[in-house]
């Protein structure tokens, strides 16, 4: 779902989810945070490029997953689990020292 590599001081992170308009699932949030933390520690990386290899860049959060998760357990903690992961990623991205360039080349 998330591809990444480092070349010439640039970390390239690619959203690559089949179906779902690249909506961010819980696992994608966890994976993105892990990748960004690894990049942050790597002094060789000067910039991050975030892109997509799908027709759609990213629809945002996976609301279907949030709804289904909450419907199964009907507990506020189930709902908060997703949003905690999302907030953790948002906070990290807002405070990281590495600049991120985001772009999308629409594929038809």
Predicted regions and their residues:
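Catalytic-core regions built around general acid/base machinery
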Residues: 35, 85-96
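Alpha-helix capping and helix-loop boundary segments enriched in small/acidic/polar residues
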Residues: 23, 77-80, 106
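Glycine-/small-residue-rich active-site loops that bind phosphorylated ligands and cofactors
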Residues: 20-21, 55, 107-108
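Conserved CoA-thioester-binding segment of acyl-CoA-metabolizing enzymes
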Residues: 1-51
């Amino acid at each position: 779902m998330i591809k990444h590599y480092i070349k010439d001081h640039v970390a390239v992170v690619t959203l690559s989810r089949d179906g779902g308009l690249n909506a961010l699932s819980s696992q994608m949030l966890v994976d993105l945070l892990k990748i960004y933390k690894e990049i942050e520690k790597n002094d060789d990386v000067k910039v991050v490029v975030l892109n997509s290899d799908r027709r759609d860049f990213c629809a945002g959060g996976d609301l279907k997953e949030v709804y289904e998760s909450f419907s199964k357990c009907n507990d506020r903690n189930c709902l908060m689990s997703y949003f905690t992961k999302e907030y953790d990623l948002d906070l990290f991205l807002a405070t990281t020292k590495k600049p991120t360039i985001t772009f999308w080349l629409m594929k038809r």
